[in-house]
Amino acid sequence: MHTITNETDVWAGNDWSLFSVRGGTLTIKNGTVKAKDNDCYACDVQYGGTLIIEDGTFVGNISAVYVHEGKAEIKGGTFSIVQTETEGDPYRFLLNCYDSNRQAGKASIVVTGGTFENFNPADNAAEGAGTNFVDEGYKAVKIAETPAPNGTFQVVKNAKVDNADELIGALADPEIANIEVASDIDLAAKSSEELTFEEHKTIDIKEGVTLQLGSANFLTAEKGLTLTGKGTLDNSAAASTAVVAAASDVHEHKSLIHVTGGDLLIDGVTLINDPEYHWHGSSYNTAAIAYWNDANVTIRNARVISGEFTLCGMGRNGANTATVTLIDSFFESTSSNLDNKQHWAYAMRLFGSEVLIENCEVKGIQGAVSIEENAKAEIRSGKFYTVNTSGQQDAFYALYVSSSAEVTITGGEFSAPNVRTGLQIEGTSAVVSGDNDTDGRAEV
């Protein structure tokens, strides 16, 4: 691929850009177009021309793409600017039209794809507050908080779904990256195979809306999942198999989300993984969220409740290299070793290379937080505690560190109701390090 750039200034008279489309149609499919710092735009359109950008990297000054008269169709690519505007939002003209021509219908920008640094193409101030360049059927999704101050936005194909079949179809369609769930959907009859998707998906569950799973199915993200909104993902209404399991040596797990690769971001959603179900399966642990390999996990502003694990790392002996970031969220497990005297769990079991917990509340009975498998963790703030089941003394530790994990505690409250004596490990009854395998370490 080629790079088009300039070492001397281009800007003069009507020469504004490295590519200037003055009538006719120009299609750019790849490569890099980088304007000299503090000089010109990357591309402009004049005299009724049409610019089609399918891919590539475009770096401009004030604007990456400017349309004076004509049309720009942006289907892909990455867009940024070096020189910024001096007043108002400094990045607001990254995409821009000549105002009077846009108002007269002579200048337009239509965005159906692409990645934009510090600029939301669906909501910006280029042509006044609330300017939207994104075409119908597409949506701008914030994919990163960096670079400052506005982060990075990506435009993806959007689908609004109202029933189970529409949702299954959207998960299977590789071109649909964003799915909006605006009404209750019952997925209990769908298989886990139908709920497995190979491309990264964003699922936005609107406030007051419930996405209902069954007793034996769950979402599987092979290349990541972003789950947003103020709605609920729930399987607790599904018929519990606890009675059947109690009479059998074969136990099934219940989960909401499995992530085997890519990044998992949960923001604002409530997850309820049957709080009355206390069995693990023969292949998988019961966990609201289970993650493998390098599936980095970020959970913020969320509520996660489960009958066993709320969050569970999978893959021992260094196989799990995830980073886990938990911020401003609530986690609760109702698991106790007295439930069935066979299966139990901490509120969360964290594997991976790095763990950060900040301003979270984690509540358990069997235990709150277990950090294992060589993880390097920092707990900055929050509340971590266990409670006894009514009439019992079954609560264990607020924090348990094992298997060579290292945890640094710089803030937070840790409490447990019972004094555990006879422990051949360091720590207190609330914060405990070490196990029967390899010692872990907690520093306060």
Predicted regions and their residues:
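Detector for repetitive beta-architecture
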Residues: 1, 23-25, 30-32, 48-50, ...
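Generic recognition of long tandem-repeat/solenoid scaffolds
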Residues: 4, 141, 150-158, 219, ...
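Extracellular beta-strand/beta-solenoid scaffold signature
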Residues: 8-22, 35-46, 59-68, 85-102, ...
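Secondary-structure transition/turn motif
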Residues: 32, 154-160, 248, 383
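Activation/maturation switch segments at domain boundaries
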Residues: 70, 169-170, 174
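Extracellular/surface-exposed low-complexity segments
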Residues: 76-77, 81-84, 88-89, 96-170, ...
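FAD-binding core/adjacent interface of flavoenzyme oxidoreductases
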Residues: 236
